[in-house]
């Protein structure tokens, strides 16, 4: 059984998180994707990895996601970035940590470098999707969809069996969080893993991230026949192998 905790950020905001404590040591911080949560295979797999390798672990659900409080349509990249930074500061304190960002989580992870420059030791990106709101959504919306979202402030999009709401404020906030023009000079281990058959986010997004990090020991791993989530047993093992290389 997985034990979840809640951290009260404000009088009305509670964030659910997974935590394995390590008083003086390195942590692994997992940041999940858009409309995801902590019930999937990745956070639990990385939690087990951390326990076996004598590491601390932290994963959280942004507001409006999973069992955290809040309404999804009130959220945006700025808010979710801030929530992640607050809970990292509260739980990890001054310990060093490795960031793992899955899909949108990689965008949130890149944003953490402005808060924790001296603490971040490495970064593992999985199907990384920075700037997806503008580049993969807004720029590809038909004219009618754009007109509807401008008029109503929201539109419901279908993706496979799911339907999710996209707000105008979310799109606009995404534009304030551009990262591809950034330059990050930290000397860290950086590995980006991307499925060759990722139908949600093209591998070029991982290539673009490599250009952001100027002094990193960096590599791109393209998983043959890999999908966007990379959540099968063998792919999770690959991710954990790459994480171990980042740590060592």
Region annotations inferred by a language model:
Residues 11, 107, 119-217, 222-223, ...:
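The alpha/beta-hydrolase serine catalytic core
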Residues 35, 62-67, 130, 227:
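Alpha/beta-hydrolase active-site loop signature
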Residues 35-41:
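Short substrate-entry loop that stabilizes the transition state in hydrolases
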Residues 43, 47-69:
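Conserved alpha/beta-hydrolase
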Residues 101-109:
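Gly/Ala-rich beta-loop-alpha elbow adjacent to hydrolase catalytic centers
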């Amino acid at each position: 059984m997985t034990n979840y905790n809640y951290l009260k950020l404000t009088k009305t905001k509670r964030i659910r998180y997974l935590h394995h404590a390590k008083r003086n040591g390195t942590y692994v911080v997992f940041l999940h994707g858009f409309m995801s949560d902590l019930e999937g295979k990745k956070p639990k797999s990385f939690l087990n990895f951390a326990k076996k390798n004598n590491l601390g672990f932290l994963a959280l659900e942004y507001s409006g996601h999973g069992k955290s409080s809040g309404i999804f349509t009130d959220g945006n990249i700025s808010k979710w970035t801030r929530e992640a930074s607050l809970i990292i500061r509260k739980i990890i304190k001054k310990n060093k940590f490795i960031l793992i960002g899955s899909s949108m989580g990689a965008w949130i992870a890149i944003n953490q470098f402005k808060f924790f420059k001296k603490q971040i030791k490495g970064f593992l990106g999985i199907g990384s999707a920075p700037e997806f709101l503008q580049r993969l959504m807004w720029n590809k919306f038909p004219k009618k969809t754009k007109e509807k979202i401008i008029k109503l402030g929201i539109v419901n999009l279908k993706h496979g069996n799911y339907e999710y709401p996209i707000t105008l404020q979310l799109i606009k906030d995404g534009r304030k969080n551009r990262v591809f023009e950034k330059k990050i000079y930290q000397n860290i281990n950086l590995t980006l893993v991307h499925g060759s058959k990722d139908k949600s986010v093209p591998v070029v997004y991982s290539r673009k991230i490599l250009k952001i990090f100027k002094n990193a020991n960096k590599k791109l791993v393209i998983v043959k026949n890999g999908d966007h989530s990379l959540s099968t047993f063998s792919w999770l093992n690959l991710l954990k192998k790459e994480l171990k290389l980042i740590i060592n």
